[in-house]
């Protein structure tokens, strides 16, 4: 749900057999959901032989949070565009400050900064990253009040709660952090 109201399905123009949704469907609460083609979903109880249940299944607090989150997203169709603009601004600033020494991957409101000069498209290219430099980058930002993913192998997420001032401050400090590193 981080790139559009139908997530990667809409972004990449695909129709999957099964869709899984994580915390966003519960407004950040511990919940997940899945759905799929009719013939697959008919295999799930009570219509089919596959039983699915769990401790958190149908948790009223999480489902209420999820309904409210989905209502907010539905009633504000520009939210995805705002998220992408904010994230693109951060990604562009990191690319510029990294001066070819980092690979910044970004889509929608998701981004990652890899400390490698090559494109990162898979695990093999990701592990060429310099984790010590990332740790220094992380520490520089954390010491100045900016919390990013503690590992370059995790995705950073931008929220609509992040203000333009937050984005500007992060761009400035990320640039300083990257310029302080010895590439």
Task: For each feature predicted by the language model, list its residue ranges.
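Conserved N-terminal phosphate-binding loop of PLP-dependent enzymes in the Aspartate aminotransferase
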Residues: 1-183
């Amino acid at each position: 749900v981080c790139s559009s109201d139908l997530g990667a399905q809409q972004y990449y123009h695909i129709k999957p057999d099964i869709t899984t949704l994580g915390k966003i469907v519960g407004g950040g609460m511990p919940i997940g959901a899945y759905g799929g083609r009719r013939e697959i979903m008919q295999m799930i109880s009570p219509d089919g032989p596959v039983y699915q249940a769990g401790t958190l299944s149908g948790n009223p607090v999480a489902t209420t949070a999820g309904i409210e989150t989905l209502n907010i997203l539905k009633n504000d169709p520009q939210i995805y565009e705002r998220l992408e603009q904010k994230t693109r601004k951060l990604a562009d600033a990191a690319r510029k400050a990294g001066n070819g020494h980092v690979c910044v991957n970004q889509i929608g409101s998701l981004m990652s900064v890899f400390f490698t000069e090559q494109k990162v498209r898979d695990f093999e290219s990701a592990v060429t990253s310099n984790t010590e430099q990332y740790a220094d980058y992380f520490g520089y930002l954390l010491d100045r009040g900016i919390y990013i993913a503690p590992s370059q192998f995790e995705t950073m997420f931008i929220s609509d709660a992040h203000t333009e001032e937050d984005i500007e401050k992060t761009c400035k400090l990320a640039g300083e952090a990257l310029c302080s590193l010895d590439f």
